[in-house]
Amino acid sequence: VVVDGITVINPDHYTVFGGGSVGVTIRNLKSFSCKGWSDGIDMMCCHDVLIDNVFMRNSDDCIALYNHRWNWWGGSDNITVQNSILWADIAHPINVGGHGDPESLIGETIENLIFRNIDILEHDEDDVPYQGCMAIDAGDRNRVKNILFEDIRVESIQEGKLFHINIRFNPKYDKQPGQSIDGVTFRNITYNGVGENPSLIKGLDKERMVRNITFENVVVNGEKIKDLKGFITNEYI
């Protein structure tokens, strides 16, 4: 399936929704939304997806990648988002890992995701648990692994944070906690701004930990991140 060169203005819900889809290309898409729940591109249990050269200004998540929801099962893998501009008037520019299969004994995996050469123009979310320009929020028995964020430029955060990496149990959305986050690299990330909340990296407990998070040339207000000073963390990382 190829979606190429369309402009969508004020849809009632998602601009593009993928459920159990394989081999999808979305390119040269422009999306402008202002209604509640009007995410840009949401993918549930999709595989082999390329999102290229899109402009998303949305009144919810610009890009959201999930596992099981509604009638789709089977995990998610091999999704690339590149050469794009994201502007989130509420919620996240990039959000990974929220929905999964709480009834499964082993859960589902979302893996092998690449986000590269992306400009984030704005992030404005007043509800702290849902903040994060680059958010990985593993719930509902999800396992998240092998994620690359590369060459990302963040211009403005009105209300929000830069990074949010969390294994969660949120009763509003989850029936079970997430399982793991393993292998996330942030490379060549820049942000210049003031007033953002501290970034967060947290596991849930000894069985549900965050592992192998790498920062390479991440520069905030001209200073390279060398440690997690200023981050919110816990002992489960």
Question: Each predicted region: which residue ranges?
Answer:
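Extracellular/periplasmic carbohydrate-active domains that bind, remodel
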Residues: V1-I237
